[in-house]
């Protein structure tokens, strides 16, 4: 889709198929690059519905647009917010564009976009292993799993089955823990490793994406003068994790986007 009107028309079509007037409506794969970098606002999404929460996830996965109802439910529809993750309109209220995992997760539960849905389930792992056989792949990874106790238990059961035909290497995503607690957690996970389930590694996302401008860029910055992007983890925390991980012999995979994050 190359216009905001086209996006809204498709959302309206989907909205009409929902019986519950308060049920959330979710969309994904939005990319303003194809729209002349026009930004979707809560006012735009309010044209689809003001009674149900609506969200549209960007193709980059780093930005979420929501309507006024979603902001209200999450407590973000207020003045006084002063953070680059939450752009404000001329009235000092959030525009509805939310950048980065922390602010996105604060509204996710109200719009049907719970990050736990991105974790693998048993059937998904079984089906994926069959695809691996067809492609001749023996070892696969999940590079951003929260690895909750429930998820780890599920992975243990699925990968221990005689007909599971791949080796799975999921990485613990750094979110919601201190560096020391993170290292301790992956140390505990490593003890649960088996031949077909290799645990005990870390995944860090350092900054936002270049699409939408939340990546951290060196001088001279973005071509259009947009403010520099977001650190998803402070450089000080990142350094602490690296030092602790090296001491503990833990592998860390770091995802970066902007050249300043390098």
Language-model features, listed with the residues they occupy:
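Divalent metal-binding segments
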Residues: 1-184, 204-261
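Short amphipathic
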Residues: 198-202
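Acidic (Asp/Glu)-rich catalytic clusters
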Residues: 158-162, 186-197
